[in-house]
């Protein structure tokens, strides 16, 4: 697929895809569809549903939009009582939990093939986000990612001509970007890292800030959990990766100590910092401010692979009561296939999603757009999924990052304490799955 792939070609692909599988031809059914797209993305979703209903006379989808948290609270009881919706969107941080509790039904290879859903059309790690114990439970409809925003004007002023892609390049560029309020640079006599006028990179102390540490750990060959799904983010690979990030503050003085996301966001908007790693959801904000900025994939801080954090939403089929209408399940799979075709995914990117598949990332509508700077590596985005106790792992991990970044604890001590706390919580959580 070339970079000149157009929407017309995508529509042609959709038409071919529709002919490649046996479309639903059963009796007319009505599907209930529960999702949490309640913001600016809601009108886009409603438009897609209207298009589906208009082109599928024997399938009518009735959608209900409500806050994600409400769905997480209600879904177990709905499944247990046999009143589950036909299709539910579940996010990456919740899906493994619902799968492990038996609230979501697996999608067999035969079902996916019959519905025309080809796993290969999606980015591999994104599709596998909804896999568990070798089975698939969902199809991705939406994706977001942790990226690096960079200020082109400040980089030019500081003589930086290349967006860093490696650890060494990041450190060199960050040092070049950093100046204290007296005009001194890192390494010069009298340099004051506690009073910076401009600085190289934004680090901060909340869960979003910790996702850079997560990326660095994966890049270095580490992981949040081990094969037994116990916390393991204090491995030597993890300690080394996080130590580099903390050293950007404590050793090199190219990032502000103990800062917040809000403070760093404001500083980037004001042209004070060269590199602002965060969620791609700030794209519209920076474009609205008419900033001269770019978007790049997270530099490879580790030595093993490219990796960045990603969030995603997946179309799933909840477990239904005995005697559930098989026609409804076939129709629901038809709906899932249609919603995740290239043409629909291209439309969905209007709501702020990243492309979920290379065919859409190659569309010419993205040419010249800042966000296209990450498209070559969308296959290296990894969600924090695959273990049922995400909260029990991520809460202590986020706290460990905050303690290490702020200097309250050494990196190793912070990660060790985080793993200890996470595993205590996991031990308790395991009892609820027995």
How would you name each of these model-derived features?
Residues 47-122, 131, 153-165, 267, ...:
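Extracytoplasmic "Venus flytrap"/periplasmic binding protein-like
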Residues 54-55, 60, 156-158, 243, ...:
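Extracytoplasmic/periplasmic substrate-recognition and gating elements
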Residues 92-147, 188-197, 212-215, 292-297, ...:
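Hinge/lid segment of periplasmic solute-binding proteins
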Residues 121, 125, 296, 349-403, ...:
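Long, aromatic- and glycine/proline-rich binding clefts that accommodate carbohydrate-like moieties
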Residues 173-175, 227-258:
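Glycine-centered hinge/linker elements that transmit conformational signals in sensory
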């Amino acid at each position: 697929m070339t970079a000149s792939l157009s929407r017309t070609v995508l529509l042609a692909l959709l038409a071919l895809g529709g002919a490649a599988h046996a479309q639903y031809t059963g009796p007319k059914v009505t599907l209930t569809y529960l999702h949490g797209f309640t913001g600016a993305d809601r009108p886009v979703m409603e438009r897609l549903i209207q298009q589906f209903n208009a082109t599928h006379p024997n399938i009518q989808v009735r959608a209900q939009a409500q806050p994600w948290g409400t769905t997480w609270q209600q879904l177990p009881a709905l499944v247990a009582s046999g009143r589950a919706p036909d299709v539910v969107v579940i996010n990456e941080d919740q899906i493994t939990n619902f799968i492990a509790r038996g609230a979501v039904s697996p999608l067999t290879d035969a079902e996916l093939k019959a519905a025309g859903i080809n796993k290969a059309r999606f980015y591999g790690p994104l599709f596998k986000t909804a896999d568990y114990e070798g089975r698939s439970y969902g199809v991705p409809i939406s994706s977001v990612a942790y990226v690096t925003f960079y200020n082109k004007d400040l980089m030019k002023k500081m003589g930086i001509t290349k967006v860093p892609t490696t650890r060494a390049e990041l450190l060199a560029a960050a040092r070049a970007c950093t100046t204290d309020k007296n005009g001194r640079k890192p390494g010069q006599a009298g340099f004051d890292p506690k009073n910076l006028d401009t600085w190289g990179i934004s680090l901060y102390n909340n869960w979003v800030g910790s996702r850079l540490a997560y990326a660095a750990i994966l890049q270095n060959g580490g992981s949040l959990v081990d094969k037994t799904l116990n916390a393991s983010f204090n491995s030597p690979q993890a300690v080394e990766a996080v130590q580099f990030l903390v050293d950007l503050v404590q050793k090199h003085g190219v990032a502000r100590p103990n800062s917040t996301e809000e403070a760093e966001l404001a500083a980037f908007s004001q042209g004070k910092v060269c590199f602002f790693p965060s969620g791609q959801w700030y794209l519209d904000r920076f474009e609205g401010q008419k900033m001269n900025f770019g978007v790049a994939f997270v530099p490879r801080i580790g030595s093993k692979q490219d990796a960045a954090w990603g969030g995603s939403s997946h179309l799933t089929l909840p477990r239904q009561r005995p005697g559930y209408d098989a026609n409804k399940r076939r129709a629901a799979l038809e709906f899932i296939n249609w919603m995740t075709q290239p043409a629909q995914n291209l439309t969905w990117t209007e709501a702020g999603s990243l492309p979920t598949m290379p065919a859409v990332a190659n569309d010419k509508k993205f040419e010249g757009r800042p966000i296209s700077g990450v498209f070559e590596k969308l296959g290296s985005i990894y969600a924090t999924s695959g273990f049922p106790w995400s909260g029990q792992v991520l809460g202590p991990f986020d706290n460990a990052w905050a303690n290490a970044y702020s200097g309250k604890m050494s990196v190793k001590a912070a990660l060790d304490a985080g793993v200890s706390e996470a595993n205590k919580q996991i031990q308790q959580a395991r009892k609820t799955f027995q």
